[in-house]
Amino acid sequence: MKKNVTELYKTIDYIFADQGLLEQAMTHRSHKGQHNERLEFLGDSILSFVIANALYAKFPKAREGDLSRMRSTLVRGQTLAEFGLEFGLGDYLRLGPGELKSGGFRRESTLADAVEAIIGAVFLDSDIERCGELILSWYEERLNAISPGLNQKDPKTLLQEHLQARKLSLPGYTVVDTKGQAHNQTFTVECIVDGMDSIISVGSSRRKAEQKAAEKALKILKNEP
């Protein structure tokens, strides 16, 4: 891998006993050698089970349809890609020359697949209990925020849909400042929307800062206070 994995271990909060599993999880099918598709398959199933179980316990009165919608929101590719960005997986992915040249290290589907592959690798490296604990620690913020019956779309998605409906360019997000150590950082994000002044927001994670910025932009576009 291009970077030392020590920082990645800190970011995902797990140290592999078998580093080969992590290397496989970070290997795209375009790269020579054993790639991550089998681990992705395994991780996808484990993630779905862990999140379904957590939602079932958290919302004892929720209907099946609401539980399914919440699970879909939490395990969809967009959510997993957000984790991939937060973890900085693009710096560790092993890609073939063509995929690397085309920017595969930042492609949403590639990042999402890598997150699922890491989950599969963690399970094989430990057990279902440790793997489940890790997944729930990653998802703590999102599980606390979600509720049955509510619109499951987050501010970034709503802003994107608002702009697309008006045939406008999609927003851009840039981290302009990061302070603090891993697990205790503050991120400053700039959101750029055509025709608007740039919007600056701060959050304890890149995702939080981006969501705050998107929410501000949406309110301005809708002329809300």
UniProtKB/Swiss-Prot annotation:
Q: What class of enzyme is it?
A: hydrolase
Domain RNase III intervals: 5-127
The DRBM domain, residue ranges: 154-223
Cellular component aspect of the GO annotation: cytoplasm
Q: Which InterPro entries match?
A: dsRBD_dom (IPR014720), RNase_III (IPR011907), RNase_III_dom (IPR000999), RNase_III_sf (IPR036389)
Please, which domain of life does this record's source organism belong to? Bacteria
Q: Which UniProt keywords apply?
A: Cytoplasm, Endonuclease, Hydrolase, Magnesium, Metal-binding, mRNA processing, Nuclease, RNA-binding, rRNA processing, rRNA-binding, tRNA processing
Role summary = Digests double-stranded RNA. Involved in the processing of primary rRNA transcript to yield the immediate precursors to the large and small rRNAs (23S and 16S). Processes some mRNAs, and tRNAs when they are encoded in the rRNA operon. Processes pre-crRNA and tracrRNA of type II CRISPR loci if present in the organism.
UniProt subunit comment: Homodimer.
Q: List the PANTHER family hit by this protein, alphabetically.
A: RIBONUCLEASE 3 (PTHR11207:SF0), RIBONUCLEASE III (PTHR11207)
Protein's recorded name? Ribonuclease 3
